[in-house]
């Protein structure tokens, strides 16, 4: 496969790829890693093979490989070939985390990560009343200028930050409860909300790819401006009442989401 360097549009009318050559090479190799064509632990083609395949100079190939190293997709050691990291991408099944944890059990996200042999941790960054963004306010059906209780945390796996989470709760639900206190909640907020009389009945996800904000870029230690996966999840209780709206942001090159469903 050859990466063309011309800016001339193709005959079918597609716009030219204006990225630098090393970025295009990294993009093709990244796709092969994430699709499994380059399996975990497998060596990447040699520099000579990549130079021939992409008609590129040695320095360009090295820049492309450095991009993949910075993204934690491959690892290189002196005197050895560059290989695909064992945990190149994690598949998340949102439905596995929605039910409240059993009494005394840890939050489901932590428990599910442990089942996969990963060391997961949540760090609570802030808890306070705020005016949420317009999409969150609409999801919670808040009046104009009405506030919500924000619980802001960052999730890490094996010491690496992987997800930035901002959960918002109507003050009528959260004010005066542990949800509004700056401390962790055993079993997570779903279990506490159920105890408070607001069991989760339905969750709706809206997933989009976004360019990371400055906050997201820094918190997730992103190596480049690769897109992030942004999920707006709205949780409803009895009588179709929204009780939680959560904005979750994951590094797009490290995660994929899996949804299981049947036709309506």
Regions found by a protein language model. Name each.
Residues 12, 119-264:
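C-terminal all-alpha effector/ligand-binding and dimerization domain
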Residues 2-24, 52-53, 63-139, 143-144, ...:
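HTH-adjacent hinge/linker in prokaryotic transcriptional regulators
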Residues 45-46, 64, 81, 126, ...:
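Residue-level "edge-of-site" marker
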Residues 36, 41-55, 68:
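A short alpha-helical element within helix-turn-helix/winged-helix DNA-binding domains
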């Amino acid at each position: 496969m050859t990466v063309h360097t011309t800016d001339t549009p193709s005959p079918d009318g597609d716009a030219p790829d204006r990225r630098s050559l090393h970025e295009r090479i990294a993009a093709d190799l990244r796709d092969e890693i994430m699709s499994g064509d380059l399996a975990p632990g497998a060596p990447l083609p040699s520099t000579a093979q990549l130079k021939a395949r992409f008609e590129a100079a040695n320095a360009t190939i090295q820049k492309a490989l450095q991009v993949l190293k910075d993204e934690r997709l491959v690892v290189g050691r002196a005197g050895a070939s560059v290989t695909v990291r064992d945990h190149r991408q994690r598949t998340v099944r949102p439905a596995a985390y929605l039910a409240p944890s059993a009494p005394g059990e840890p939050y489901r996200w932590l428990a599910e990560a442990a089942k996969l042999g990963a060391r997961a941790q949540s760090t609570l960054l802030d808890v306070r009343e705020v005016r949420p963004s317009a999409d969150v306010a609409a999801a919670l059906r808040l009046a104009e200028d009405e506030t919500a209780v924000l619980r802001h945390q960052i999730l890490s796996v094996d010491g690496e930050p992987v997800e930035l989470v901002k959960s918002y709760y109507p003050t009528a639900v959260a004010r005066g409860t542990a949800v509004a206190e700056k401390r962790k909640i055993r079993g997570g907020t779903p279990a506490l909300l159920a105890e408070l009389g607001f069991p989760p009945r339905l969750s709706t996800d809206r997933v989009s790819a976004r360019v990371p904000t400055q906050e997201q870029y820094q918190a997730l230690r992103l190596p480049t401006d690769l897109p992030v996966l942004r999920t707006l999840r709205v949780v409803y209780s009895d009588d179709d009442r929204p009780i939680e709206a959560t904005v979750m942001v994951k590094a797009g090159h490290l995660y994929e989401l899996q949804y299981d469903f049947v036709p309506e």
